[in-house]
From Swiss-Prot:
Its EC number(s): 4.2.1.59
Swiss-Prot/TrEMBL keywords: Cytoplasm, Lipid A biosynthesis, Lipid biosynthesis, Lipid metabolism, Lyase
SUPFAM superfamilies noted in UniProt: Thioesterase/thiol ester dehydrase-isomerase
GO CC terms: cytoplasm; membrane
Name the UniProt record assigns to this protein: 3-hydroxyacyl-[acyl-carrier-protein] dehydratase FabZ
Length: 150
């Protein structure tokens, strides 16, 4: 039995995801098990454009950006499991349920992204997702994504 981790650097993530700056929101994958789970990170930097208006005197990383980071992490796991979508396919966010924000995320934080693949049915993937900072839950959600022909 081996203890090797399946990790992905930013170039490998960019090969899997279509997102680019300023909307590529997964910086590194520390470990993943295809079809099971993924642990990635998003580094929160004050240089990100959303901090100019959210909020100027008290910068807080927007909750929708945390959710997008989690959604992108589901994409990385799905693509690492089943391969990238074909040219005529699109993978997109379908729904979010049980969304809870537990603590603010601020510049300098490292957002730990934890995604568990629950099931896939007819191209709809369901994931249990948690974003943490220093071991504390910042956000949790059930996310569904769809893979469809366009």
């Amino acid at each position: 039995m081996t203890n090797e981790l399946n990790s992905l650097d930013i170039k490998e993530i960019m090969d899997l995801l279509p997102h680019r700056y300023p909307f590529l929101l997964v910086d590194r994958v520390l470990d993943y098990v295809p079809g099971k789970r993924l642990h990635g990170i998003k580094n929160i930097s004050f240089n990100e454009p959303q901090f100019t208006g959210h909020f100027p005197d008290t910068p807080i990383y927007p909750g929708v950006m945390i959710l997008e980071s989690l959604a992108q992490a589901t994409g990385v796991l799905a693509f690492a499991t089943y391969g990238k979508p074909a040219v005529n396919e699109l993978y997109f966010l379908a729904s979010m349920d049980k969304v809870r924000f537990r603590r603010p995320v601020i510049p300098g934080d490292v957002l730990d992204l934890e995604v568990i693949y629950l099931k896939d049915r007819r191209g709809m993937g369901k994931f249990e997702c948690v974003a943490k900072v220093d071991g504390q839950v910042a956000c949790e959600a059930m996310i569904m994504c769809a893979r469809r022909e366009i």
